[in-house]
Amino acid sequence: MDMHARISQLFQASIETKQQAMEVILPHIVQASELMVQALLNEGKILSCGNGGSAGDAQHFSSELLNRFERERPSLPAIALTTDSSTLTSIANDYSYNEVFSKQIRALGQPGDVLLAISTSGNSANVIQAIQAAHDREMQVVALTGRDGGGMAALLLPEDIEIRIPAKVTARIQEVHLLVIHCLCDLIDNQLFGSEE
């Protein structure tokens, strides 16, 4: 195997996936950022969840809001539901792994908050239950998905927003998810604190 050629192929595949996605998801990213900004202006917060790499994305997003993205600014209220190992394991042990996020949302979520739900397949059972719990708490949902949107897409209400990456390879979907997260952080900062350009 020519490793240089393989790396070049992977870069090219990532670039092509991002270009294809950009044509489809731009308006949804704008809408999601506006929804999140409105929640923050109304003293709400953003909860986030996902599994595996998507759990890392949920944590990445919340840390960019809680700390900072690319400028000095006040901290913004965001909680990744993927970080408390005691809570996650106790819920999984006493109830079900499918409830590890939904039980937290029922405790922490308030009307007007936003849930950022991340799954490359759209079929993660615990993320699907998180969306159901968010709706029960009168929260709106931003769903980051891929492929055909899976069960998550079927659950979304008209006021929710799906950002679906038109790709099938998990790694390519994850790469675009990270870019979307950075776009959201940038747009949130610019809407709340003004453009730096």
UniProtKB/Swiss-Prot annotation:
Output the InterPro entries linked to this UniProt entry.
GmhA/DiaA (IPR035461), Phosphoheptose_Isoase (IPR004515), SIS_dom (IPR001347), SIS_dom_sf (IPR046348), SIS_GmhA/DiaA_subfam (IPR050099)
Name any GO cellular component annotation. cytoplasm
Enzyme Commission identifier(s): 5.3.1.28
- Catalytic activity line of the entry: 2 D-sedoheptulose 7-phosphate = D-glycero-alpha-D-manno-heptose 7-phosphate + D-glycero-beta-D-manno-heptose 7-phosphate
Q: Which one of the record's GO molecular function terms can you name? A: D-sedoheptulose 7-phosphate isomerase activity
- What does the record's cofactor remark say about binding? Binds 1 zinc ion per subunit.
Q: Which family does it belong to?
A: Belongs to the SIS family. GmhA subfamily.
Q: What else is known?
A: The reaction produces a racemic mixture of D-glycero-alpha-D-manno-heptose 7-phosphate and D-glycero-beta-D-manno-heptose 7-phosphate.
Q: Which HAMAP family match?
A: GmhA
What is this protein's name? Phosphoheptose isomerase
Give the taxonomic lineage as stored in the record: Bacteria, Pseudomonadati, Pseudomonadota, Gammaproteobacteria, Pseudomonadales
